[in-house]
Amino acid sequence: MLRKIRIALATVFFLCITLLFLDFTGTFQLYFGWMAKVQFLPAVLGLNLVVIVLLLALTLVFGRIYCSFVCPMGVFQDIAAWFSRLFRKRNPYRYSKPKNVLRYAVLAVFIVLLVLGFGGLAALLAPYSSYGRIATNLFQPLYIAGNNVLAGMAESRGNYDFYTVEYWMRGLPTMIVAVCSLVVVVVLACVGGRTYCNTICPVGTVLGFFARFSWLKPYIDAEKCKSCGKCEKNCKAAAIHIAKGEVPSIDYSRCVVCGNCLDHCKFGSLTYGHPSKQNNSPKTEGNKPADAGRRAFLTATAVATGAALVKAQEVKVDGGLAAIEDKQIPERQTKITPPGSLSARNLAQHCTACQLCVAECPNQVLRPSTDLKTFMQPEVSYERGYCRPECTRCADVCPAGAIKVISKEDKSSTQVGHAVWVKKNCVPLTDGVECGNCARH
């Protein structure tokens, strides 16, 4: 039953969040935009304490249900693993020892990058951001191509319910990052299920620590267990250890509460609930008390996280204006950020680099940055499009508050940069023709 509930909820969340990245009309944002705002990293960078407390509370009660069906990257791994099992006879899942050194090292690097202001690089490790880049750069072109085919077919029959949409590749670096992320995640999912979640993902590491103390969890009745190994072979988190002559154990820091073990146990030895003394359940790896080293590390992590949150609250408007040159199109020293971002510094501190705003921009004026410090975060590029004064789509969809919601009136009066007149490019001077476009626009 638990597995069926998980699959149903995971399907709803995954489809709705994916449609947020694919949709170019803004329709799905009205109904499902909140699903992006309840993702863990956007909530942390946006200082959304309600969502943070809610996710931690749910983890302390039910375990890592966030990783099970809320996180789109987690569900995407399950889909990839399911397809891989169609082409193999044996289930690849086996118990593996926890790689805690690697997990906490990646988490430490993630926090340090956030503290130092390299949010774009830190987002390369974040699950929601990684899936957003995959959906925006790899899935959305296919979605738009399908729409354009339908639009052409409908137009030939006199139906104009569909309309064609132009798509352009937003940069080679962002495409390479998306492809690499897709390959790494799919390979890890096909080989070991939730390996990414339990070795690389910083969100999984944080929630895994709290899940060790969850009130409800799957537990094994040692008296009923026959050590058949069915649960171990179907645990996609490699968290169940069953061995002859040994007490069966579950590592709750890695368990994602998928319910697979419950469905495959034929002896009724597995139960999802609160393990009490009356249940005579064995001690599990996930319930071992933390040693002094672990406590010291968690203390350091808490301090670093606090520093990151304090840093995220700094809002400085730095102008972001490029030096004006009258010789050629100037090289922008500071990238232009969307109205509502307050400043380049504020955008860099709060943006998760999920590229939802890039995917939703109707005029394709936003593109991912290639600068090291703001890598994959959005910047305004007028070389490909223009920003409509009445459009506030990027602010409406931003899940982390990096682009603040702004009224159309305020947007029209917000200066994001200066126009630069390049004399040698002015056709009235070079060709002697009438123009006046700059005055009209």
Report each predicted region and the residues it spans:
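Non-ligating segments of multi-cofactor redox enzymes
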Residues: M1-R254, G259-H441
